[in-house]
Amino acid sequence: MSPELFFAALLLVPYVDCLTTALNDQLPLTPGEYEVFGNPKKYKEYFEYIRSYAPYNNLHKTNYPPMLVTSSIFDNRVLYSEPTKYIAKLRDLKTDNNVQLMKCKLEAAGHGGASGRDNAIKELAEEYSFLLKNAQIKK
């Protein structure tokens, strides 16, 4: 993973704590994912493999670009705790002054974001604004 390659990042309801999710077979989507990713509770090689690429498990002390990370309290695909836990660890480890924003949607919004055209446009405007502010475009 090479965070230095990016001037900014949008992580929109990201699946960043793959290993913890895969270890919890009480979550409704986890058992079905064993066919795709393997069962890390049952097989050590799947545990090690998932840990090798899981974003949460691969954070380390370094500079990270400015980030806008989103989640939704009503998302049943990526629990809001995953991005929240990720951003907390990232803030603890980062070695720069770049902003790491966390936005958790508390209104009815699922994995795909806000419903309704106006709300979707507002979200898109916030995301573009974040990227443009951090693009460091010179006049």
Each model region followed by its residue ranges:
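Active-site-proximal cap/loop segments of hydrolase catalytic domains
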Residues: M1-K139
